[in-house]
Structures are given as C-alpha cells and as structure tokens.
Amino acid sequence: KSSAASDVYKRQNQNFVSETFANYSQMFDKHEVGAMVGHSYEWYQYRDSYLTANGFVNEALGNENMGAGEKANNIISNGFSKSKLVSGMARLNYTYDNKYLLTATFRADGSSKFGKNNKWGYFPSGAISWKAHEEKFIKKLNTFDELKFRLSYGISGNQGISPYQTLSRYGTTKYYHQGQWLTAIGPGYESGQSGQDGIWKIWSGIPNPDLKWETTAQWDFGIDMAFFNRRLRVTLDIYNKETSDLLRERNLALSSGYDRMWVNDGKIRNRGFEVTIDGVMVDKKDWSLNGTFIFSMNRNKVLDLGSSVESGLLKDARTGMEYEVVGNLSEQYRSYTNILAIGQPINVFYGYKCDGIIQTLPEGL
C-alpha cells in the first residue's frame, strides 16, 4: 500500500454588477445646474470544495481516483456564501458665475449581510467651494493662477463583514484527534469521544440580529493654489473623521463556551493634515523634470468602546488605563498583544517592558 496523499481544491467567485444612471444639466445666464439619479445592484457568490485522501494501493492514477484511498482518512468539505447590495443615489450640482460651487449627494444602501430591521443605511453628503482666483480683487494681485477653497462634510457606511453574521451558525470543521478526523458542534457537545478525551468545538457564530451599518462622518477643508503659469502647485488638506457603531468581534468570557461575536460598538477618530507640492522644474522641448513633495501627519484615537463593553474592560493597575485585548483572550499568553484602549491609538501594542537580559543562572532564579 502506498503512502501517497492526494488533494483537490476548487474555488469559484462570481460577481454581477448592474448600474443605471440618468443625468441632467442646464445653463442659463450665470447659473449652471446638474443632477444625477442612479441605481446599483450587486450580487456576489463564493463556492469552494476540498477533497483529500491517502493510503492508495499505488500512485499510478494520481488524483483521478480519490475514492481508492482509505475511507477512514478521506476528507470532503465545501463552502458556500452569497450576498446582495442594492443602492439608490442622487446628486445635485449648482455653480454660479463659475466661482461658487455647491454639491449635495444622498444615497441609500441595502445589504443582505445585516438583520431584517437594519439592512438599509442612509448616507448624505455635501460640499461647497470658492474659486477665489476668479474674483477681480484676486486677479489684481497677479500672484495666483489658481486659488480655490473647499469644504465638505459627509456620512458613509461600511458593510465589511462576511455574510450570515446575524445568524446562529454551527461549525462543521473536522479536527484530527486520536488517529481520526472528527466533527464537533456547539458548546457542551462532544463528538466521537467521551470524557476528558472529547472534542469541544466553539460554536461558529453567535447570532446578532441587531447588526447594522458602521458609519463614518467626515469633514474636510482644503486649499488649491497654482503659481508661475501653473508650474508650481500647492494643495493643503485638513480632515477630521469619526467612525461609530464599529463592526468588530467582541471578546467573550471563555467560560461561556464561545470566544467572540460580531457587534456594533465603540467609536474611533482619525484626524490630520496633508501638504502636497508639485513643481515643473525644467520644461524643454525634448525633456522635462518634475518634482513632488508630500508631507502628512495623521493621528487616530479610540474614543469609546461601547457602554456594554466598558463595564467589563480590563484595567492597568499602574496607570488606570482601561482596555480590551484584540483577538482571542487565550492568545495573549503566547503572542504579542494588541489592545483597544480609550484615549490611545487603535490596536496599540501592550506588554511588559524589558529590564535587561538574564546573563547567569542565579539571575534567573
């Protein structure tokens, strides 16, 4: 009998997107009006299958006769998931005298990933800008080829989770235990063995029918400038972004038989500014030389971790800092630990500081 093993793996992704838009524009006197309405439909499906076998009589057929392997060691598994996203959107643009610009946008998105009462999210946004270089008093300065001020505010949504997170899910993964592949389901249920040798499988998913869209509110202020016949361009941007109802996996007490579940809680803030300078240093007929300088400073901070979580936060005895460990609680005993701490950047490292290296045996005792 041969010790050869054979594996066959197949994965298929299918994605269908349909978008329909209607546009309108009209100019009269110093006014310009534009409008757009649209509809989008997206369908996604994933499927995979995996076969493995060993203990063949010989290797002549390769993986073309998987059934010839030892039945006790054969593994057959497959996965399937699908999701849908339906969106409607509208935008209105208005410009007066080619100086003052206004944009208003609204969109509604419905995702199959969320619960019955939270499938839809509604996200408005707006922006205004002023082309100051078109004003007579700016033109008299003979300095700017372009001087534009921008201000915007908007709310956007995130559905970045796998399908079925709102449902109760049992795990069917097989584990190799005492010489055979076994499947275990649900907390408190043993599979294939008894007593202390039994396999205990943490439930694949705790249902949360209240899962909803994660939302981000952001404002931006910017200035665009151009000099020397637009050979030098300078762009300044300042932004503040706050994300609430974070979609994340919350740690649960291991004594519950579960490890984590998807929830909406907490808030983080990102803010900063960016400066970009583009210059055309040489512009000849046969060659040119351009340069770009970029400087940015960005900061993020955890503002809160949700009222339901904060009551069970860990606390640093020395500093009083409240925090939650990122990932499975059991992992903190054997790997680097990231934490979510109120007032700190997201996923900061947290652990002991080194006091030195032990050089002799007595030092380590």
What are these regions (language model features)?
Residues S3-Q332, T337-L340:
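Extracellular/periplasmic, surface-exposed regions of secreted and cell-surface proteins
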Residues A68-E70, S111, V348, I357-L365:
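Extracytoplasmic gating/loop element in the C-terminal half of outer-membrane beta-barrel translocons
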Residues D265-K267, S330-Y333, Y352-C354, Q359-L365:
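Extracellular/surface-associated beta-sandwich interaction domains
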Residues E324, N338, N347-L361:
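A detector of mature, structured extracytoplasmic domains
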Residues G343:
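Extended ligand-binding clefts on enzyme/binding-domain cores
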